[in-house]
Amino acid sequence: MKKNTHPQYQKVLFIDSASGHRFVCGSTLKPDATEKFEGVEYPVSYLSISSSSHPFFTGSKQLVDSEGRVEKFKKRFERKKEASPADTPPESDSTTENASVEKKAEKKRVTAKGSKK
């Protein structure tokens, strides 16, 4: 078996930034920061959202968004919507369409006259 092929598995302290909830879980992450939790020092990884702050698990209808991603997306979407042309289809060049229709009608007249002779 090859040596040094698998990442080191260790216990890491995860901290939810939105709610402040802390929990220890095994992980291959290698964070630089450390913090004491229940008398033991663990490497620390900060989460933007976890089961303690996610609306599905909390039962609330609001999303706790510490970074403002939702607002940024809404603003960007509104700007894009305003900048885009109206939802109506673009007007076609009616003169080109009329000319092609007239040519087809003329061909039908010519073939109809030729078939009578």
Curated annotation (Swiss-Prot):
This is Large ribosomal subunit protein bL31B. It comes from the Bacteria. Residues 100-109 have a biased composition (Basic and acidic residues). The keyword Cell division does not apply. Keywords: Ribonucleoprotein, Ribosomal protein. Signal peptide: none annotated. GO terms for cellular component: ribonucleoprotein complex; ribosome. It comes from Protochlamydia amoebophila (strain UWE25).
